[in-house]
């Protein structure tokens, strides 16, 4: 099972090595505005899943939101420590 830290390490590696065909690289190249729109979309899907779908569907949507938040962190040049300071 992948953890929050594992995911960030994986995404950081993709951002650094830029493998061909990577969705993460494509999203980073699209920029902060595009990533932000995706975060808003995913947040709405999390909410709707919480209200109207199974716990499994909610967990899947939450994982997608976490992914896009971490991509935004990379796009902004932030680390996990930058965010953890505010928890």
UniProtKB/Swiss-Prot annotation:
CDD domains: NTP-PPase_HisE. GO terms for cellular component: cytoplasm. One of its GO terms (biological process) is L-histidine biosynthetic process. Keywords: Amino-acid biosynthesis, ATP-binding, Cytoplasm, Histidine biosynthesis, Hydrolase, Nucleotide-binding. It comes from the Bacteria. Its EC number is 3.6.1.31. Its main location: cytoplasm. It catalyses: 1-(5-phospho-beta-D-ribosyl)-ATP + H2O = 1-(5-phospho-beta-D-ribosyl)-5'-AMP + diphosphate + H(+). Pathway: Amino-acid biosynthesis; L-histidine biosynthesis; L-histidine from 5-phospho-alpha-D-ribose 1-diphosphate: step 2/9. GO terms for molecular function: ATP binding; phosphoribosyl-ATP diphosphatase activity. HAMAP family: HisE (MF_01020). Belongs to the PRA-PH family. This is Phosphoribosyl-ATP pyrophosphatase.
